[in-house]
Amino acid sequence: MGKHLVRCLPALLLAGALPLATQAATPAAASKQVQTAAAHAGMALGAADLKMAHAHLQHVVNCLVGPAGTGFDASAANPCKGMGQGAIVDAKGDAATEARLQQALQEAESGLKTTTLDDAHADAQKALSTLQTK
């Protein structure tokens, strides 16, 4: 029985350490994804046409919800690929940040429904301001 414990001990230690490592990386992962989402909200704000504004607003959504989230569009680029599970997912446990990111998500999604460049720019500005708020 002692031999089995010695063989399993490294795996048990690793299994116990993984959740701690994940928790430690979560705020940093969320922060990096928020910064990337804000950059794309800024790109949407500066877009010269509606198609480009919508493309960057979709990037904002993709960064916020992550690949498993509602609203994620796999056919659009995911500039946050490899950074985490989505800023909203990675911010779990921080109620104020979650609420702010949900608001930014609603603003970006609203921008995706616009039919004029001015309206898309207005929603991109709202999302950018929300994402830059601390």
Residue spans for each PLM region:
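Bacterial N-terminal signal peptides that target proteins for export
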Residues: 1-12, 16
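Mature extracytoplasmic or organellar-lumen-exposed domains after removal of signal/transit peptides
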Residues: 25-134
